[in-house]
Every structure is written in structure tokens, then in C-alpha cells.
Design a protein with these regions (language model features):
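Mid-to-C-terminal Rossmann-like scaffold of FAD/NAD(P)H-dependent oxidoreductases
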Residues: 2-4, 23, 51, 274-375, ...
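Short hydrophobic core segments
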Residues: 8, 79, 96-108, 167, ...
Length: 439
């Protein structure tokens, strides 16, 4: 009988695994996709919220496309438990057996444990259903309070402003994007947003939310109160692994996987937000809940499920977001306290570069710059490449430290492009260097 591949989760990781399996087996195996919802792209939900695309554009795999890939689709079902000894997955409506299993169940939003956090004026923005609720709720002139100033909050900031709502951001940490950029970069971002009418409350912990006549009143720990028609919680996410308790899989923050994306059971793989796998810079296990990692994980796991032997070098921690025309990014070990640091700032242009070094190896970077500046866009790609390539830059380190705003000579001179080619080719999984040369 043909092997049965069971994929749990229809997001980026799961769909990339399916496509990769089919690239290698030409339809010879059985693939079953289990998903709570019809597959859609979470990363485009902000564009749906802002009215730039219709809801129909958020979906990523049509029934016809999945049928063409010979995928049996079971939507509207949730995974509830796993028996790795019997190769059985327990669902909300029964049990499925498998030969191998990919767990790609993504993340879920986390709300602070405070009074009023579940009130009618309080929303999250993570699922399509939650996006629909906000599309219906936000109107021009609405008073919106965004609780949290991390990456998730910044992905929806533009959409809220595009709807001509009045926006206030409340953040417990003393700066914006506290898990993504440093104090100096955050100060530039704060100044940029204030110029565009965004009210900021950093260093302000939320104590409670009260419902007053269909509106919300937020009480901060320092006693200040804020009125809002809509409150959006953007206070973090965590991997969807709660249903795996007692399964026997090794769990930490996520599902621990090796360099083949294999979990502690030989025929179980994990990919995307739920996988805790190798970090290309540190070599340590980490959860990187970002789209590029989900894509890479899915392709590597899918190749291995199809019988290939593909090793994953590791994912690069990176976050890139654009806020009102300002690009903000960080890569790798951007907060390494023991790293050697080179910094350049042009505050009048809202431009900032920070490079972090271990020896002559670039291990982390922060970038801030206006989107209209072409060199900002170019530098984003080159900083990512220099960090991900992971090789010593030799004499080019001194060049970069002298001129952090001029990356191209070092990127080209150090041969970073050639070193990146064996790591990833157009988003596909790693291939052996001899295969690259042969091509």
C-alpha cells in the first residue's frame, strides 16, 4: 500500500510540505490534510483589514488545486491528541492513522490575565474570523487602542490608520518593538509615528478594562485611564502544542526537532510556529514564528517525508515590518550583549544601522530607514544574506564597520551570494553543494 502522509495544519508550513512531497513522489503516496479552517495566508490579513484586498484573496489553496495534488482534505476538524505508539491522531470527530505525520498547527494569541480582557469591545487579530470582526467594527474616526507594540501590533498598524481611525498604542516595555530593536532604533520609530498622529504610552502596564456603555475604559497601572471604542490585544503568541501533553513527544517551548525537522518519534515531523529547531546563527534550538521559517520548514520536512535525506542548516531569526513608510528590521542575534558592535545613525533621515560581530562573522543586525530610500530596500536583503551566510568576512568587516550604510561592496566582495546558494534556492530546501555545481 502507498504510504499515508498526514498533515495537521493548512498554513504555510503544511502547504509547502504537501507541494514538496508531490514534487518528489509524483502522486504515488496518500496525503491527508487536516485543518480547522480552509487554508489561508495569515500574513495578508492586515491588507484585508485595511481594505486593500477582498476576503477572497486571503485563501491560499483552492479545493481544485488541492484535488489536483491528490490531497484528501478534512477541514473543520481539530487535533485533540496523539498516540505515537499506535500511529494514531485523535480528532474532534474521530481518529486517523498515518505512516508519517507532520504537525504544523501554528500559534495562538495570548491575552494578559487582567479584568475585562474578554469584554465585547476587546478583539484579537490572528485568525480570519477575528479579522472579519474588526473589519465590521472599525469605522472612520473610531478610537482604537492597540495593546502591545511588538511585531504583531506593527503588522496591523498601517491598516488601522488607513481606515482613518485614531490610534493609541499601549506597551508595558519602555520602548516600541522591545523584542525586535534596541533603544536608539525604537526612539526613531516613536518619533516617526508621533509625527503621523499616533499616541504612544510606553512603560505603561494595562491593569484592567472596564465596559462603559458599549465602549471600553482602559485603566493603566499608574492610574491613567484611556477611552476606546475598540481595543485590540497584540500581546504575543504561543505555539499550539497544548493538545500534545502526554503524547510522549519531547516538548519545550515548541516541539523539539532535529536538523531533518523530525520530532522525538521517528515518523513525526514538526514545522513552522510549533517547531523548536536549529537557529543558523546560534546553533541552539529556537522557535521562530515567522513566514520564511514556516516555508523552509515545510519544504524540508516534506522532502524528508517523501524519502529524501535533506538536512536543514537552521533558520534565521528575522523580523521585517513597515510602519507608515518606515522600514524596520532585525536579523540574527541583534541583542547579543557580548558581541562587538558598529553603529551608524542619521536621525534627520530616520536612518539607523547596527551591526553585531563575533570575530569577523556578522551575527546580528538592526536596520531602520524610509521605504522611499532605495538603499533601504537593498540593504534589507544584503543584511539578511550577510547574517545568514554565516562566514567570516575577513577584511570586509573593517569596510562595513567604517560604512554601515554602504553594504554592497562587502556583500559582493566577500562572496556572500555564492555561499547562500547551497543554503536556499528560491525558497526551496537545502541541496548538496555538488548538486548546485552540477546544475
Amino acid at each position: 500500500m502507498p504510504p499515508r502522509h498526514l498533515i495537521v495544519g493548512g498554513g504555510t508550513a503544511g502547504l509547502n510540505a504537501i507541494r514538496t512531497i508531490r514534487e518528489h513522489d509524483s502522486g504515488a503516496s496518500e496525503i491527508v490534510l487536516v485543518s480547522a479552517e480552509r487554508p489561508y495566508a495569515r500574513m495578508v490579513l492586515p491588507y484585508y483589514l485595511g481594505g486593500q484586498i477582498s476576503e477572497s484573496r486571503v485563501f491560499t489553496a483552492t479545493p481544485a488545486r488541492l484535488a489536483a495534488l491528490r490531497v484528501q482534505v478534512r477541514t473543520g476538524r481539530r487535533a485533540l491528541g496523539l498516540d505515537i505508539a499506535a500511529n494514531r491522531l485523535r480528532l474532534s470527530d474521530g481518529v486517523l492513522e498515518y505512516d508519517d505525520l507532520l504537525i504544523a498547527t501554528g500559534s495562538r494569541p495570548v491575552k494578559p490575565d487582567i479584568p475585562g480582557a474578554e469584554g465585547p469591545a476587546v478583539h484579537s487579530f490572528w485568525t480570519l474570523e477575528q479579522a472579519r470582526a474588526l473589519v465590521a467594527a472599525i469605522r472612520e474616526g473610531a478610537e482604537v487602542v492597540l495593546v502591545g507594540a511588538g511585531f504583531i501590533a506593527f503588522t496591523i498598524l498601517n491598516a488601522i490608520l488607513a481606515l482613518k481611525a485614531r490610534l493609541t498604542i499601549v506597551e508595558t516595555a519602555p520602548r516600541l518593538l522591545p523584542r525586535m530593536i534596541d533603544d536608539e532604533a525604537a526612539a526613531l520609530v516613536a518619533a516617526w509615528l508621533r509625527r503621523r498622529g499616533v499616541a504612544l504610552r510606553t512603560g505603561s502596564a494595562l491593569a484592567a478594562i472596564e465596559q462603559v456603555g458599549g465602549r471600553a475604559r482602559l485603566r493603566l497601572a499608574d492610574g491613567e485611564t484611556l477611552a476606546a471604542g475598540i481595543v485590540i490585544m497584540a500581546t504575543g503568541i504561543q505555539p499550539n502544542i497544548q493538545w500534545l501533553g502526554g503524547s510522549g513527544l519531547r516538548l519545550n517551548r515548541g516541539i523539539l526537532v532535529d536538523d531533518h525537522l523530525r520530532a522525538s518519534a521517528r515518523n513525526v515531523y514538526a514545522a513552522g510556529d510549533v517547531a523548536e529547531g536549529p537557529d543558523v546563527v546560534t546553533g541552539q534550538a529556537a522557535v521562530h514564528a515567522i513566514e520564511p521559517t514556516a516555508m523552509e520548514h515545510g519544504r524540508v520536512a516534506g522532502a524528508n517525508m517523501a524519502g529524501r535525506d535533506v538536512r536543514y542548516a537552521g533558520s534565521l531569526l528575522m523580523n521585517i515590518v513597515e510602519a507608515c513608510g518606515l522600514d524596520i528590521a532585525s536579523f540574527g542575534a541583534w541583542e547579543d550583549a557580548d558581541a562587538e558592535v558598529a553603529v551608524a545613525s542619521r536621525p534627520e533621515r530616520f536612518a539607523y544601522r547596527k551591526l553585531l560581530w563575533r570575530g569577523d562573522r556578522l551575527v546580528g543586525a538592526i536596520l531602520v530607514g524610509r521605504s522611499i530610500d532605495v538603499w533601504t530596500t537593498n540593504d534589507l536583503g544584503m543584511l539578511k544574506g550577510l547574517t545568514q551566510a554565516g562566514h567570516g568576512l575577513g577584511r570586509w568587516k573593517a569596510v562595513l564597520c567604517r560604512s554601515p550604510f554602504d553594504l554592497k561592496p562587502a556583500f559582493v566582495g566577500a562572496g556572500s551570494t555564492g555561499r547562500l546558494l547551497p543554503i536556499t534556492v528560491l525558497g526551496k530546501p537545502s541541496v548538496a553543494p555538488d548538486e548546485v555545481k552540477a546544475g
